[in-house]
């Protein structure tokens, strides 16, 4: 059996989930291939889409929130969205790969790939099994565009899922895929030593995701009073340079706080917490 995993780099979570799916399928003997779906429209397009999205979310989160709510308000299963048309525009460029690789299954961890594959199926250009993996804790706008065989999501998304024009049998409430390495830590002391932390100190890890989402300085301020003098806090700001700068200005001199940018892989640090 062959599987094609489609994702894109608008934030790191989609790719992380995609690689978790790839890892799990490979362990079960499935031949897998990973591709950036937007890159079928060109590497420059993929880089531009990713950079614009990440910078917009980081620089203007309130504006992004308003845009998101507007998109949710106009999202409908009755007509395809402008976002679908964007992703349909480069979908036919996947044909050669589908012919050469001939996957039995396509798994998408981003709406963009899901919309492209939907276009291919609607035009009889590919007819294998199609699975959509939601990497958010909600059903986001324009997901109605996607016509998949099964959609994997989390239980928190059940209320949102009910408004979609998909049969209940199409949902699997499994949660967001994680790497096989994300297992309960059995030796905290060794885990702390492995990432250079003091094994004698209680450790808290604050992660803002790959984009450094949320008000990290404010979260640090809330955690420190309950951390105690012996505790230690590691803050991962991801690619959010501004969040790292503000946190450094406010807490860089506090010996209880360590500030990091992007951490790859993140699992060993989480295991130490």
Residue ranges of model-derived segments:
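Short hydrophobic segments within beta-strands
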Residues: 6-8, 35, 133, 206-207, ...
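A nucleotide-sugar donor-handling region in carbohydrate enzymes
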Residues: 149-211, 240-242
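Conserved N-terminal ligand/cofactor-binding loop architecture of enzyme catalytic domains
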Residues: 20-95
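Donor-nucleotide binding loops and adjacent catalytic segments primarily
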Residues: 188-190, 197-272
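Short helix-capping segments at alpha-helix termini
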Residues: 25-30, 122-127, 166, 225-230, ...
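Active-site and donor-binding regions of nucleotide-sugar-utilizing enzymes
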Residues: 12, 17, 69-173
